UniProtKB/Swiss-Prot annotation:
Protein name: Translation initiation factor IF-2
Residue numbers binding GTP: 399-406, 445-449, 499-502
Gene: infB
Domain tr-type G stretches: 390-559
Positions of region (Disordered): 50-304
Organism listed in the record: Halorhodospira halophila (strain DSM 244 / SL1)
NCBIfam families the UniProt entry points to: IF-2, small_GTP
Keywords linked to the UniProt accession: Cytoplasm, GTP-binding, Initiation factor, Nucleotide-binding, Protein biosynthesis
Places the protein is found: Cytoplasm
Any Pfam family: IF2_assoc
Lineage, top ranks: Bacteria, Pseudomonadati, Pseudomonadota, Gammaproteobacteria, Chromatiales
Region (G1): 399-406
């Protein structure tokens, strides 16, 4: 091996030169300079010296045998990194680099493992010895505590059974009790310290010098003695377990004896305080140490699901329903999705859907009604109690349009109402009170047009007698049959008035025969229906008709309660510009006074004025009296009940409740419709829609017009009435029509000045109508214009194939004779064989001799080339046809 210098060797080993020189001097090699040479023998001598140990190594933890316990090695390494240097903003050219010197220092320490294991073993043995000493102390304390507890128990039993001794026992037991408590506390402290000794390091324990000495002695014992110590430790563990079990059994027995001795204690207890009470409390502490631990309460998970009774109103939101079931809204929405219902957290659902969801979630639904206050009001008005008086009959005149209902009533009233109606047809329910020699009667005139079915149904429900007017020259018509059905549904008697008897073609027997087919049998034919022949023009039979009505009313014995809150029904409602909402009301029971608080549907208010059919203001209206009521908060629906209530606050509450319930139901229905039509809406682009906005003079007309227009909907064109209302057309109506691109229809109403200006500025489509026929017909024509036209095929002519030729230019050519009609060049054709279509296509060529022609008529021969078809045979027929677009209509 080549010799190295001291400095080179120091760099190789990784230690300072000064330290290497000191080690060489300590090894007896003398002090050497940095450049002095080191031979292989010098290095071996230095290594032997280092292995034997040196004072420096002894300081670092060298062993007594000369071998080092810990060796620390240090190394250094140098390297260079080239990094790009910064460049000025104005400079150009390649980027400069700079060199960075890097020095890495490493230090590793090696420790002798055998010494570490010996140290850990020593510490563990010391901990075991300390634990054994503490265990012995614990056993002594437990034995002492058991003796004290047994002595206290004997003293307690003596106190329970003794009479006078019970008073002396507390004072005698006070001292042992006070002594027993510290001992128990000491025992607990010992237990805690024992746990800490086992868990902590030996240096952190409270072991003293004696424990360490015993541990050292234990280390020097032979292996047999260690086995004996292990057996003794196991024996101590077993005894401690037996002692613990015995203590628990005794505690249970003491608790049972105390439970049995409770009645005796109550007899033996004397009212005493101070020391005696304290002794009793101390006795409880002594006896209940272990029992207190056993009686400690713990939370137990429910083994069965909690079933709740969930109250469900008529409409409820998803969030509220989830809250009532104590589940998360997300879980409820997930369950709804399983049921096929898509909903949001704030969406309202109906009662039936909510009940199904509650059952699916494992709870019990309880259906709840929101109209308790409303039912109370209805019960008050259903059975009015009080003095009953006779009332005038309510007579409804029904029949087909143009059969003379209003003219008949005009003659009875001596008025001209029919001439004032637009188009000469009735479009409102008219209520009139007629005074006669035989008494008074209230007549209701209903529309006969098919659009007013709801009006006729309402008229039949609120009447006592139905006068069915049938024209003698026209017979039974569709609305006549409908009127009979309404009367039967309402169980109202019918009086038939065969009108227009003054005409030459009048045939009353035909009317009787047609009505008898509907089971309306005249009295002269053995039935129970009165037939009266009348004429509204000449007045023929009017007295007989009134007599028949009076007779029918007498048979019914009509009564009404006089002294009760007034109750009636709304015949019609309209919005008057000067008077506000106006409701035409037929009073049925009680007297309606000015100033009464009334409620009708979702509207309420105080009666400001009462106006009769002649336009005069009255202070009250009795049973069977039609009257106009002013003062309601809004327009009630026709057919709604109206009743007087004493408390205006209750009326407001019921009206608001009805309005809210109606709104929620409407929202729920709209949402349900959206869900049901989810897939049909995907094809909505293919369906055209006509949006309409309807304003009418009265509620009944608006309702009839809206229903009639919506019934015009077609599978290709849908009619949607975005809004319908009562009153003049306002600026807000025009804005709504602009937003929804709707056509505005004014039925017997006009637009105000602001609305007219907006209509002219924005070009809104606005139409005025006074006859319902015209409005329906106009919309029907608009729908027909939006329908896609159909294609119909018209056969132009037929040619019979006589011979088939082959051409170099055209291929197969059929020599034909046109037997019917005309064959044109640019029209489609069909090839028929044995009257069966085998090919559909078009002509490629049509020639007469050698000339191309556009058409060939019947009886003329021609040559026909069929495009893309080469299987024409003699005897086939070539049919020429055209497709024509035909406009569809409803």
């Amino acid at each position: 091996m080549a010799e190295t210098t001291v400095k080179e060797f120091a760099q190789t080993v990784g230690i300072p030169v000064e330290r290497l020189q000191a080690q060489l001097e300590a090894a007896g090699l003398g002090r050497r300079d940095d450049g002095a040479a080191l031979s292989a023998e010098d290095k071996a001598t230095l290594l032997a010296h280092l292995r034997q140990g040196s004072p420096e190594q002894e300081e670092e933890g060298g062993g007594s045998d000369g071998s080092p316990k810990k060796i620390t090695l240090k190394r250094r390494s140098h390297s260079q990194l080239k990094m790009p240097a910064g460049r000025d903003a104005g400079s150009r050219g390649p980027r400069q680099t700079r060199t960075v010197n890097v020095e890495v220092r490493k230090r590793r320490t090696y420790v002798k493992r055998s010494d570490i294991e010996a140290e850990e073993k020593r510490k563990q043995e010391e901990a075991e010895e300390a634990a054994a000493q503490l265990e012995r102390a614990l056993e002594q304390e437990e034995a002492k505590r058991e003796e004290d507890a047994a002595e206290a128990q004997r003293a307690g039993d003596t106190a329970v059974t003794g009479g006078d001794e019970a008073e002396q026992a507390p004072s005698e037991e006070a001292a042992p009790a006070e002594e027993a408590e510290p001992s128990a506390a000491d025992a607990e402290a010992v237990e805690e310290s024992g746990v800490e000794v086992q868990a902590a390091e030996p240096e952190e324990t409270a072991a003293d010098e004696t424990a360490r000495a015993q541990a050292e002695a234990l280390k020097e014992k032979p292996k047999s003695q260690q086995d004996e110590a292990k057996k003794r430790e196991e024996e101590r563990e077993r005894k401690r377990a037996e002692l613990e079990a015995k203590r628990e059994r005794e505690a249970e027995e003491r608790a049972q004896r105390k439970q049995e001795a409770k009645p005796k204690k109550k007899k033996a207890e004397q009212p005493a305080g101070g020391r005696g009470a304290g002794a009793r409390r101390g006795g409880k502490k002594r006896g209940g140490g272990t029992a207190a631990k056993q009686l400690q309460q713990e939370f137990e998970r429910p083994t069965a699901p909690v079933v709740r009774e969930v109250e469900i109103p008529e409409t409820i939101t998803v969030a509220e329903l989830a809250d009532r079931m104590s589940v998360k809204a997300a879980a409820l929405i997930k369950e709804m999705m399983k049921q096929g219902v898509m909903a949001t957290i704030n969406q309202a659902i109906d009662q039936e859907t909510a009940a199904i969801l509650v059952e699916e979630m494992g709870h019990k639904p309880k259906l709840q009604r929101d109209d308790d206050v409303e039912e109370e009001l209805l019960r008050q008005g259903e059975q009015p109690e009080g003095e009953q008086i006779g009332r005038a009959p309510v007579v409804t005149v029904m029949g087909h349009v143009d059969h003379g209902k209003t003219s008949l009533l005009d003659y009875i009233r001596r008025a001209k109402v029919a001439s004032g109606e637009a188009g000469g047809i009735t479009q409102h329910i008219g209520a009139y009170r007629v005074e006669g020699e035989n008494g008074s009667a209230t007549f209701l005139d209903t529309p006969g047009h098919q659009a007013f079915t709801a009006m006729r149904a309402r008229g039949a429900q609120m009447t006592d007698i139905v006068v069915l007017v049938v024209a003698a020259d026209d017979g039974v018509m569709p609305q006549t049959k409908e009127a009979v059905e309404h009367a039967r549904a309402a169980e109202v008697p019918i009086v038939v008035a065969v009108n227009k008897m003054d005409k030459e073609d009048a045939d009353p027997n035909r009317v009787k025969q047609e009505l008898s087919q509907m089971e309306v049998i005249p009295e002269e034919w053995g039935g129970d229906v009165q037939f009266v022949h009348v004429s509204a023009m000449t007045g023929e039979g009017m007295d007989e008709l009134i007599e028949a009505i009076v007779l029918q009313a007498e048979l019914q014995e009509l009564k009404a309660v006089k002294d009760c809150p007034a109750r009636g029904v709304v015949l019609e409602s309209s919005l008057d510009k000067g008077r506000g909402p106006v409701a035409t009301v037929l009073v049925q029971n009680g007297y309606l006074h000015r100033g009464d608080t009334v409620i009708s549907g979702t509207e309420f208010g105080r009666v400001r004025a009462l106006v009769d059919e002649h336009g005069k203001r009255v202070n009250e209206a009795g049973p069977s009296t039609p009257v106009e009521v002013l003062g309601l908060s809004g327009l009630p629906d026709a057919g709604d009940d109206i009743m007087v209530v004493e408390d205006e606050r209750k009326a407001r509450e019921v009206a608001e409740s009805r309005s809210e319930r109606q709104r929620e139901k409407r929202l729920a229905q709209q949402q349900a419709a959206r869900m049901e039509n989810l897939f049909s809406q995907m094809k909505e682009d293919e369906v055209s829609t006509i949006n309409l906005l309807v304003k009418a003079d009265v509620h009944g007309s608006a309702e009839a017009l809206r229903q009639s227009l919506e019934d015009l909907s077609h599978e290709e064109v849908r009619v949607r009435v975005v809004s319908s209302g009562v009153g003049a057309i306002t600026e807000s109506d025009v804005n709504l029509a602009l937003a929804s691109e709707a056509i505005m229809i004014g039925f017997n109403v006009r637009a105000d000045a602001a609305a007219k200006r907006m209509v002219q500025e924005h070009g809104v489509d606005l139409h005025y109508y006074s006859v319902i026929y015209d409005a329906i017909e106009q919309v029907k024509n608009a729908i027909s214009g939006m329908l896609e036209p159909t294609l119909e095929e018209h056969i132009l002519g037929t040619a019979e194939v006589r011979e088939v030729f082959r051409s170099s230019k055209l291929g197969q050519v059929a020599g034909c004779l046109v037997v019917d009609g005309v064959v044109r060049r640019r029209n489609p054709i069909r090839v028929l064989r044995d009257s069966v279509v085998i090919y559909e296509g078009e002509l490629e060529s049509l020639r007469r001799f050698k000339d191309d022609v556009n058409e060939v008529r019947a009886g003329t021969e021609c040559g026909i080339g069929v495009k893309n078809y080469n299987d024409v045979r003699a005897g086939d027929q070539i049919e020429c046809y055209e497709r024509v677009e035909v406009q569809r209509s409803l």
